[in-house]
């Protein structure tokens, strides 16, 4: 199985399954002599971990990171950083009923057809538990590029949307509520809706907005490695993501060019930033902002039709511990992947500037 690595200079490879002994990763290309704040890394893990509120999965995992290499006396050595995160609260019996069946909108069927073997326990490698390793890498990436600020937040749940522009939001409020929405009135509505959906044994999707600030001009490699293309790839690699738009996004398709063009000020900044901080695939120094759409979680605590490995259609009820809505826990994952992309391009640009 390929496809387990991302990045050119700052590179992350992840391994492990949802119900295996441990998850882990190897970060290659991290510069030496960076003083790592290990507490900050663990805080990022706490943001992602299950069981943190009544509106997320109740699986209980400490998600403590154990570093194996690449760090000495609190500093990075420039060698590969290896780490593991032990799984301690697996309940594999919750998945015995799907051993011989394929749940709708899961990876069960395609994994078995492609590899002729499938770890059905909690989705195995296709589980969102894999993203714990990405959050570790993202937390380190943030410390590689401390001057670049990355803030993600929930901007919609179902049809409840936060319509304020991000410039009017106080990002410090994002972590003050279970939904991770910086507008408290909207957060309350979203949380109540998720609780209602959970009672029904159903799930709901939503969107996350991410804002990247203090970005230097020049990050991005046309033509195939444009900055927005890599951000899109990184976001679309996250479980349950169904869409990505940056800047004016799909709304820009409805506008006239005379309204959509982004004139320059004399200092090189732009007036509207409908470009979303990227032009020609290269950062222009303005804020980068994008939005990601997440589908409803596919596992329902309701009966639904499934296909068996003998090609029968039967009714089956979902078991186990699952998120009724993934977006609250996906916020640190989005930030992590954004940080990995930005650190990768930052280090690549540094190579150019040194020649």
Swiss-Prot record:
Coiled coil: none annotated. One of its GO terms (cellular component) is cytosol. It holds the Pfam family Chorismate_synt. Pathway: Metabolic intermediate biosynthesis; chorismate biosynthesis; chorismate from D-erythrose 4-phosphate and phosphoenolpyruvate: step 7/7. GO terms for biological process: amino acid biosynthetic process; aromatic amino acid family biosynthetic process; chorismate biosynthetic process. Its EC number is 4.2.3.5. The keyword Flavoprotein applies. FMN binds at residues 125-127, 239-240, 280, 295-299, 321. InterPro entries: Chorismate_synth, Chorismate_synth_AroC_sf, Chorismate_synthase_CS. NADP(+) binds at residue 48. CDD domains: Chorismate_synthase. Keywords: Amino-acid biosynthesis, Aromatic amino acid biosynthesis, FAD, Flavoprotein, FMN, Lyase, NADP. Its cofactor is FMNH2. It catalyses: 5-O-(1-carboxyvinyl)-3-phosphoshikimate = chorismate + phosphate. HAMAP family: Chorismate_synth. NCBIfam families: aroC, PRK05382.1. This reaction introduces a second double bond into the aromatic ring system. Belongs to the chorismate synthase family. Homotetramer. This is Chorismate synthase.
């Amino acid at each position: 199985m390929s496809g387990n690595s991302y990045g050119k200079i700052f590179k992350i490879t992840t391994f492990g399954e949802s119900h295996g002994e441990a998850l882990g990763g190897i970060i290659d290309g991290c510069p030496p002599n960076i003083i790592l704040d290990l507490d900050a890394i663990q805080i990022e893990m706490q943001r992602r971990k299950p069981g943190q509120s009544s509106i997320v999965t109740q699986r209980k995992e400490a998600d403590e990171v154990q570093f194996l290499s690449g760090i000495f006396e609190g500093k990075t050595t420039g060698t590969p950083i290896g780490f593991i995160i032990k799984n301690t609260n697996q309940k594999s019996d919750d998945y015995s009923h799907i051993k011989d069946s394929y749940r709708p909108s899961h990876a069960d069927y395609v994994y078995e057809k492609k590899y002729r073997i499938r770890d059905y326990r909690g989705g195995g490698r296709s589980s969102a538990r894999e993203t714990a390793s990405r959050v570790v890498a993202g937390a380190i990436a943030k410390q590689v590029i401390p001057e670049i600020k990355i803030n993600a937040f929930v901007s919609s749940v179902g049809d409840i949307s936060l319509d304020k522009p991000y410039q009017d939001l106080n990002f410090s409020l994002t972590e003050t509520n279970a939904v991770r929405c910086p507008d408290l009135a909207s957060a309350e509505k979203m949380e109540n809706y998720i609780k209602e959906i959970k009672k029904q044994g159903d799930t709901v999707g939503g969107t996350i907005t991410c804002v990247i600030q203090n970005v230097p001009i020049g990050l991005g490699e046309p033509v195939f490695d444009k900055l927005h293309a890599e951000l899109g790839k990184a976001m679309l690699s996250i479980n349950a993501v169904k869409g990505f738009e940056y800047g004016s996004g799909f709304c820009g398709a409805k506008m006239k060019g005379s309204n959509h063009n982004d004139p320059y000020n004399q200092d090189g900044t732009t007036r509207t930033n409908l470009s979303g901080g990227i032009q020609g695939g290269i950062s222009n120094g303005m804020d980068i902002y994008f939005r990601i759409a997440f589908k409803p979680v596919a596992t329902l605590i309701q009966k639904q039709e499934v296909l068996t490995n003998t090609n029968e259609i039967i009714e089956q009820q979902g078991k186990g511990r699952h998120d009724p809505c993934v977006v609250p826990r996906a916020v640190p994952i989005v930030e992590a992947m954004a940080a990995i992309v930005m650190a990768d391009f930052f280090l690549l640009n540094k190579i150019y500037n040194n020649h």
